[in-house]
């Protein structure tokens, strides 16, 4: 929370003299990310956005009480965090690339769809198969986001003359975001190969 607060102060200081309208939008979108993070961590600390779920039959942790309430610890609030923070990142990147509104809208809608269906995958307890169906739908939305980032916006950035900085941020974003579906599949929500603590730290690092 403290780190996010310091980030906000730094962004406000750096953007105090920004006058170009597009640059202002990029600045505001970037500023929203640590603001959302503060809300997320506050919800986590207060226990508002976490819970214990009983995994469905077929899941590796089915019938195993990993918490005092007899279920698997599930910090589901992080999906809400991503549903607000990742669109802001995409808006900043899209504006930096000089993209049009159609591509920007498509990327943001696909991103929100990815997060919401990811939440559905995490909260589904009636069927192990349905968890993976939701996961597959979420990954399909993710493919749309990746296509726009890697193909469409890369071309737009060349035209806008911002290719150097955009490509750097693009690679960083894609590499980090690829970790989410991987850790979901290997973590307690999926195959349960990795411990909950490991996946939580991994998500925090990304």
Swiss-Prot record:
Q: Please give the start and end residues of each transmembrane region.
A: 1-15, 22-45, 76-97, 101-124, 128-150, 163-186, 196-206
Give one Pfam hit by family name.
Bac_rhodopsin
Q: How does it sit in the membrane?
A: Multi-pass membrane protein
Which SMART domains does the protein's record reference?
Bac_rhodopsin (SM01021)
Give the Extracellular compartment stretches of this protein. 46-75, 125-127, 187-195
Residue intervals annotated with topology Cytoplasmic: 16-21, 98-100, 151-162
InterPro entries, alphabetically? Arc/bac/fun_rhodopsins, Rhodopsin_retinal_BS
What protein am I looking at? Halorhodopsin
Family listed: Belongs to the archaeal/bacterial/fungal opsin family.
As recorded in Swiss-Prot or TrEMBL, the protein's gene is named hop
Where's it found, cell-wise?
Answer: Cell membrane
Main function: Light-driven chloride pump.
GO cellular component assignments: plasma membrane
One GO MF term: monoatomic ion channel activity
User: A biological process (GO) annotation for this entry?
Assistant: phototransduction
Keywords (alphabetical) are: Cell membrane, Chloride, Chromophore, Ion transport, Membrane, Photoreceptor protein, Receptor, Retinal protein, Sensory transduction, Transmembrane, Transmembrane helix, Transport
């Amino acid at each position: 929370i403290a780190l996010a607060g310091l980030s906000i102060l730094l962004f406000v200081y750096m953007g105090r003299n920004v006058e170009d309208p597009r640059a202002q939008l990029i600045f505001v979108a970037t500023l929203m990310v640590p603001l959302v993070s503060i809300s997320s961590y506050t919800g986590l600390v207060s226990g508002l956005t976490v819970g214990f779920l009983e995994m469905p039959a077929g899941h590796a942790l089915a019938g195993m009480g990993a918490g005092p309430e007899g279920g698997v610890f599930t910090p589901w609030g992080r999906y809400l965090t991503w549903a607000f923070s990742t669109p802001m990142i995409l808006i900043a990147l899209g504006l930096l690339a000089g993209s049009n509104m159609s591509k920007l809208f498509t990327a943001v809608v696909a991103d929100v769809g990815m997060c919401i269906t990811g939440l559905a995958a995490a909260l589904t307890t009636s069927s192990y198969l349905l968890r993976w169906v939701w996961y597959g739908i979420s990954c399909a939305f993710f493919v749309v986001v990746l296509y726009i980032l890697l193909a469409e916006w890369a071309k737009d950035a060349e035209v806008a003359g911002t290719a150097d900085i955009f490509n750097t941020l693009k690679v960083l974003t894609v590499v980090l975001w690829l970790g989410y579906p991987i850790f979901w599949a290997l973590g307690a929500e999926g195959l349960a190969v990795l411990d909950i603590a490991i996946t939580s730290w991994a998500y925090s690092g990304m």
